[in-house]
């Protein structure tokens, strides 16, 4: 409840050489603050609006007019994320039948607005959709969600848009510390941990990412790229959540983002969650994902100013996430 103003946040992005941002909802205060900033944006269409948008093109046209066209080209919107972590196996299952119709309607509305070559339409998913992730080459979607994931992958393939994926080695490690080592989760393993044919894995992030690539390939989406739309590590509030672990993970993720994974070498567009600690979030660990304190002081000694790297940040009405892409 004590976060900086929208204009202060955008100024912080610019001062830290942060070149992209994710907004989880079309907050007009944030969008107005972004005008003329040259910061590229992932603009979220919230879950609560997905059913409405799916119900008719007139709703999609209105949403695009009010939240995209009214700010374009002053705000450089790069992607629209239609929903976040909608899944048949979570509390969002009631929205699953509306996911693809909403994607299609927003895609058509963006095309009608003359922005089809500028803005890609996608959705953000989490790892609960993956049934098998080990070894990474055997990655596959859960059989009971294929009816949901296959049409999404097909839509992204046909429209040449990437899948947005939230990847958190922290949760895999904290949920199974007996099987997953901390160094493997923090990018600090001294040796190969997983040998998968000719591919070698020294960190869990790559293994998780490549399992999603394999899953998409198995469903006809071998040409679909991935943007890591969230990743981070909490500094307090739960098992393994310490200041040192968070600093190590973030520092190594920043460095690793320019390298790519064994399956897909090259820069990985990766968004760090979150920009600020937030005292109103629950459970406790959700309060401690920030790169910065609400007073804009950095929690970690992270280098945002390397000339060949552009940092991205994403923001909610109440929270911010930061993302990195390198070798621009």
Swiss-Prot record:
The active site is at residues 85, 230. The gene is GLUB3. Keywords: Glycoprotein, Glycosidase, Hydrolase, Plant defense, Vacuole. This is Glucan endo-1,3-beta-glucosidase, basic isoform 3. It comes from Solanum tuberosum. Residues 306-328 form a propeptide. GO terms for molecular function: glucan endo-1,3-beta-D-glucosidase activity. PANTHER family: GLUCAN ENDO-1,3-BETA-GLUCOSIDASE BG1-RELATED-RELATED (PTHR32227). It comes from the Eukaryota. Its EC number is 3.2.1.39. The keyword Flavoprotein does not apply.
């Amino acid at each position: 409840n004590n976060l900086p103003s929208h204009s202060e946040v955008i100024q912080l992005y610019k001062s830290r050489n942060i070149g992209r941002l994710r907004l989880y909802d079309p907050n007009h205060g944030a969008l107005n603050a972004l005008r003329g900033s040259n910061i590229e944006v992932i603009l979220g269409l919230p879950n609560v609006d997905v059913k409405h948008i799916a119900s008719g093109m007139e709703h999609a046209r209105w949403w695009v007019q009010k939240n995209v066209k009214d700010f374009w080209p002053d705000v450089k919107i790069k992607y629209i994320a239609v929903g976040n972590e909608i899944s048949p196996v979570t509390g969002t299952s009631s929205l699953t039948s509306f996911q693809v119709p909403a994607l299609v309607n927003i895609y058509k509305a963006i095309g009608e607005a003359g922005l089809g070559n500028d803005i890609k339409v996608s959705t953000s998913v989490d790892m609960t959709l993956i049934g098998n992730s080990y070894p990474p080459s055997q990655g596959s979607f859960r059989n009971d969600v294929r009816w949901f994931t296959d049409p999404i992958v097909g839509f992204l393939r046909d429209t040449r848009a990437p899948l947005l994926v939230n990847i958190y080695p922290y949760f895999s490690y904290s949920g199974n510390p007996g099987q997953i080592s901390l160094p493997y989760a923090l990018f600090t393993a001294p040796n190969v941990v997983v040998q998968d044919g000719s591919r070698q894995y020294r960190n869990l992030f790559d293994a998780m990412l490549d399992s999603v690539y394999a899953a998409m390939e198995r469903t006809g989406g071998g040409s679909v790229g991935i943007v890591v739309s969230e990743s981070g590590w909490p500094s307090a509030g739960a098992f393994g959540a310490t200041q040192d672990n968070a600093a190590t993970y973030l520092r190594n993720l920043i460095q690793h983002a320019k390298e790519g994974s064994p399956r897909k070498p090259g820069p990985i567009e990766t968004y760090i969650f979150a920009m600020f600690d937030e005292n109103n979030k629950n459970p406790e660990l959700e309060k401690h994902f920030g790169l910065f304190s609400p007073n804009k002081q950095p929690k970690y000694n992270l280098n945002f100013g390397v000339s060949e790297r552009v940092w991205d940040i994403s923001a909610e009405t109440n929270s911010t996430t930061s993302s990195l892409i390198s070798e621009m």
